Regions:
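Glycine-rich catalytic cores of cysteine/serine-nucleophile enzymes that process amide/ester linkages
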Residues: 25-26, 82, 86-89, 93-97, ...
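Short, flexible active-site loops
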Residues: 153-155, 174-185
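Boundary regions of SH3-family modules and the immediately adjacent low-complexity/disordered segments
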Residues: 1-5, 10-12, 19-37, 43-78, ...
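N-terminal non-globular leader segments, chiefly Sec-dependent signal peptides
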Residues: 1-8, 183, 214-225, 282-305
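...with weaker cross-activation on analogous glycine-rich loops/strands in unrelated enzymes
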Residues: 206-276
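Active-site nucleophilic cysteine motif
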Residues: 173, 185-204, 208-211
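Charged, glycine/proline-rich intrinsically disordered loops and linkers
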Residues: 141-156, 160, 220-230, 280, ...
Length: 305
């Protein structure tokens, strides 16, 4: 097995035919693969598969990957966009622009509210410290011994509490409001329904399945069954839980409201809607396509109890 990191700002994963987009990865994200070629099938650090161009990956040894994990100086861009500057001042030359979700190596040098970072392509420059957060998720799936159980047994981030986690994921999700819809996307300039909830959970240290369904082996469980009344959602769901329809997913915010990214022709983006019939922003079409599952994010906690 070979290992590497993405060395461009963004790269799309495709179906084997190289035409249909299935996912998006960013600077510094880890992948592994077996067979070489112009196009290769990769496994991501969150267990998803897809095909991408080999020249977008910087090959690394497994030892390098493990050492990066242990070092703990990988940070993630939390702002929609963040410029990498040659110097630690706003007037300096811009070297690169990073999007939310990009991983960088944070160096010790800091100045004027900036910190020096190193990118996966070797570029080094300064980024505002407020645009970064210490990475909380893990690459260990790529070399783990228990692949089937890794995601339900992934470690709890330091200082974790259910109340804090729920508050953080809701706050993070709202950062995508107004973002346009893009099939397979996970970026602040284009994202799909499952991309939003995946990124929100990743930014807060939990890796979930990337698509709009509940996949065995990942930290989600159903707390609502098909055929039950919609009114039961508010009784059982808490802020930060995920709401699943067939082929669609959103995040419950509380008070009968949910955030989702939709390709519907009248919206085509990320917005908030109501579950309550009679509200101005109630989605009749989603009400008719009754959600098949209600997913309780906190199985992540139960799995560690």
């Amino acid at each position: 097995m070979k290992y590497g990191i993405i060395k461009v700002k963004r790269a799309f994963l495709y179906e084997e035919n190289g035409v249909d987009v299935v996912d998006e990865v960013f600077f510094g994200w880890s992948v592994m693969w077996e067979d070489e070629g112009e196009w290769i099938e990769v496994w991501t650090h969150y267990g998803y598969r897809g095909w991408m161009e080999r020249n977008l990956i910087e090959e690394k040894s497994r030892e390098w990957m493990e050492e990066r994990e242990k070092a703990g100086n990988t940070y993630v861009v939390t702002r929609g966009f963040a410029d990498v500057m040659r110097g630690a001042r706003v007037q300096s030359r811009m070297l690169e622009t990073l999007g939310r979700g990009c991983f960088v190596e944070k160096m010790e040098e800091t100045e004027n509210g900036y910190c020096r970072v190193k990118l996966a392509n070797g570029i080094s420059g300064f980024v505002p410290e407020v645009a970064l957060r210490k990475r909380l998720d893990s690459d260990r799936f790529l070399w783990g011994k228990s692949e089937e159980r890794f995601f339900v047994e992934q470690g709890i981030p330091e200082g974790w509490s259910e109340e804090k986690f729920r508050r953080k994921v809701v706050e993070c999700a709202k950062g995508y409001l107004g973002c346009q819809y893009r099939w397979g996307g996970k970026a602040a300039d284009g994202i799909d329904c499952s991309g939003v909830v995946f990124m929100v959970y990743l930014m807060n240290g939990v890796l979930i399945w990337r698509d709009a369904d509940i996949r065995e082996g990942y930290p989600m469980k159903a707390i609502w069954r098909e055929g039950e009344e919609m009114c039961l959602v508010e009784e059982r769901a808490k802020a930060g839980d995920l709401l699943f329809w067939r082929g669609h997913v959103g995040m419950y915010l509380g008070d009968g409201r949910y955030l989702h990214c939709t390709g519907h022709e009248r919206v085509f983006g990320c917005r908030v809607n109501s579950l309550r019939r009679g509200d101005e922003d109630f989605r009749e079409d989603l009400a008719e396509a009754t959600p098949t599952r209600r997913s309780h994010s906190m199985i992540f906690t139960a799995a560690r109890a």
